[in-house]
């Protein structure tokens, strides 16, 4: 498939066309295809996180070391408890800040393969309807770049090498926040700051 044919300007389609395209892409994701899609923060590489072969492809495309965990994107708050343990503090944060530009790292339940993450798993619910619609299974969510390079906020900023190796690219225009998500880890009743992004850590600490 040529580069032009794999890039889908999703918001230029009418509602009926968009629905058809998204249904097609959901089937393709279930079949192990790799998709780049814009989120509220950055463009990310998404694959079925339950499919180890597809996840391995994501690592290879990014040239990322396999000992570095990936985060996942889920469709809604109810999905989080399928894949991670949620205590009262985590629930408060989830209810207040998700969907939104936050990655919350929680103790992982069995189900997500260890190639994605071992003991703890980072989980996102982006404030962007297209990626949530595609999340009929948990999707990998990792920036659409070669590891260590700049993270893209538009399709034009994505490395050509990365574009060539994925199956589809969903162009949503410029990402809403255009900077990385804030990352926190919940251990017992403590919030551990991993990376400050869109949401200030102090705001989260008030929970």
UniProtKB/Swiss-Prot annotation:
Main localization of the protein described in the UniProt heading: cytoplasm
A GO MF label: nucleotidyltransferase activity
Entries under InterPro entries matching the protein: DHBP_synth_RibB-like_a/b_dom, Sua5-like_dom, TC-AMP_synthase_SUA5
Localization in the cell: Cytoplasm
GO terms under cellular component: cytoplasm
Any one GO biological process: tRNA processing
Keywords in alphabetical order: ATP-binding, Cytoplasm, Nucleotide-binding, Nucleotidyltransferase, Transferase, tRNA processing
Chemical reaction(s) catalysed: L-threonine + hydrogencarbonate + ATP = L-threonylcarbamoyladenylate + diphosphate + H2O
Gene3D superfamilies documented for this protein: DHBP synthase (3.90.870.10)
Pfam families noted in UniProt: Sua5_yciO_yrdC
Disulfide partners: none
Stretches assigned to the YrdC-like domain: 15-199
Enzyme Commission numbers on file: 2.7.7.87
Similarity annotation: Belongs to the SUA5 family.
Function according to Swiss-Prot or TrEMBL: Required for the formation of a threonylcarbamoyl group on adenosine at position 37 (t(6)A37) in tRNAs that read codons beginning with adenine. Catalyzes the conversion of L-threonine, HCO(3)(-)/CO(2) and ATP to give threonylcarbamoyl-AMP (TC-AMP) as the acyladenylate intermediate, with the release of diphosphate.
Identification of the protein by name: Putative threonylcarbamoyl-AMP synthase
Organism: Methanocaldococcus jannaschii (strain ATCC 43067 / DSM 2661 / JAL-1 / JCM 10045 / NBRC 100440) (Methanococcus jannaschii)
């Amino acid at each position: 498939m040529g580069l032009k044919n794999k890039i889908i300007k999703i918001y230029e389609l009418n509602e009926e066309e968009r629905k058809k395209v998204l249904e097609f892409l959901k089937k393709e994701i279930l079949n192990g295809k790799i998709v780049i899609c814009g989120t509220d923060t950055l463009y990310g590489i998404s694959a079925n996180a339950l499919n180890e072969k597809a996840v391995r492809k994501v690592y290879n495309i990014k040239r990322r070391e396999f000992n570095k965990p990936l985060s996942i994107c889920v469709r809604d708050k109810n999905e989080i408890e399928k894949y991670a343990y949620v205590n009262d503090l985590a629930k408060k944060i989830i209810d207040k800040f998700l969907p939104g530009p936050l990655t919350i790292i929680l103790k992982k339940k069995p189900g997500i393969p260890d190639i994605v993450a071992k003991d703890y798993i980072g989980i996102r619910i982006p404030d962007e309807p297209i990626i949530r619609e595609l999340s009929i299974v948990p999707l990998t969510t990792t920036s659409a770049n070669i590891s260590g390079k700049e993270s893209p906020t538009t399709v034009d900023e994505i490395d050509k090498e990365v574009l060539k190796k994925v199956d589809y690219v969903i162009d949503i225009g410029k990402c809403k926040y255009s900077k990385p998500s804030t990352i926190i880890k919940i251990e017992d009743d403590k919030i551990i700051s991993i990376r400050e992004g869109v949401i200030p850590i102090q705001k989260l600490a008030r929970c």
